[in-house]
């Protein structure tokens, strides 16, 4: 079992296929997704990787958070989450995951906080039909109707569907298809809609109901060494061309 990723919802667009069909997609961005910590069986009692994404100003962090990111030697992150993995799915602290972690045609489960709708009535929140438009109904056209029975049980049962706060719930959408990936820009294009508002953080994991493709990288799709912060190779002195003198400069 391999790790998921943290992605930011950027919005929706459409992609045209080779046969002329256009597919509605949600664009997800992977912003500096790095391993912040490891959880190991002998020390923590379970196996997981802790990922961080985005960037945060140090002045906006608490002292424990600054120490946590400093120990991992990664820049402060705006969002942190853990993903359970198998023993062979552990990653080194500081490793950065790219959009190549997923492949086109793969199915994923996406978890996020749904859009908040505020205080909503029964018709909007639960799809109630409401009361009649005429025939003696006044003012109560969009009301709930009856909420109980009679003297027995003499109460309204818990979890009765009523008006109340709607949305802003942690929800998971399953079996969403990855239509396309863009590793250079760190983008995932997912077919259809996903939970949450623009700019919200999402957890993207391999589908639990549909097996991942065999060509999906394991344990993860990491950014190549060429894109890392490693020091550039030194150029021999004899190969370095001397700068040419131009007008206004001393040769």
UniProtKB/Swiss-Prot annotation:
Biased composition, class Low complexity, residue ranges: 231-251
Description of post-translational modifications: Methylated by PrmB.
Transmembrane segments: none
Assigned keywords, A-Z: Methylation, Ribonucleoprotein, Ribosomal protein, RNA-binding, rRNA-binding
Pfam hit, one: Ribosomal_L3
Region (Disordered): 214-251
HAMAP family: Ribosomal_uL3_B
This protein's name: Large ribosomal subunit protein uL3
Record organism: Rhizorhabdus wittichii (strain DSM 6014 / CCUG 31198 / JCM 15750 / NBRC 105917 / EY 4224 / RW1)
């Amino acid at each position: 079992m391999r790790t998921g990723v943290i992605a930011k919802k950027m919005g929706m667009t459409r992609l045209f296929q080779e046969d002329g069909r256009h597919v509605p997609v949600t664009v997800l961005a992977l912003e500096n997704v790095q391993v912040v910590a490891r959880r190991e069986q002998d020390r923590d009692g379970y196996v997981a990787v802790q990922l961080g994404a985005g960037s945060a100003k140090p002045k906006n962090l608490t002292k424990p958070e600054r120490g946590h990111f400093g120990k991992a030697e990664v820049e402060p992150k705006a969002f942190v989450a853990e993903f359970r993995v198998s023993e062979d799915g552990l990653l080194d602290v500081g490793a950065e995951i790219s959009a190549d972690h997923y492949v086109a045609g793969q199915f994923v489960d996406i978890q996020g906080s749904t859009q908040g709708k505020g205080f909503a009535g029964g018709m909007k929140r639960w799809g109630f039909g409401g009361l009649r438009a005429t025939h003696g109904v006044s003012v109560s056209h969009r009301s709930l109707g009856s909420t109980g029975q009679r003297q027995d049980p003499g109460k309204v049962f818990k979890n009765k569907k009523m008006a109340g706060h709607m949305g802003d719930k942690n929800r998971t959408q399953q079996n969403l298809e990855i239509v396309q990936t863009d590793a250079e820009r760190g983008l995932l294009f997912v077919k259809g809609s996903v939970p949450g508002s623009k700019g919200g953080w999402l957890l993207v994991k391999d589908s639990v109901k549909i097996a991942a493709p065999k060509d999906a990288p394991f344990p993860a799709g990491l950014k190549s060494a060429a894109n890392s912060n490693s020091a550039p190779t030194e150029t021999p002195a004899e190969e370095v061309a001397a700068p040419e003198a131009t007008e206004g400069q001393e040769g």
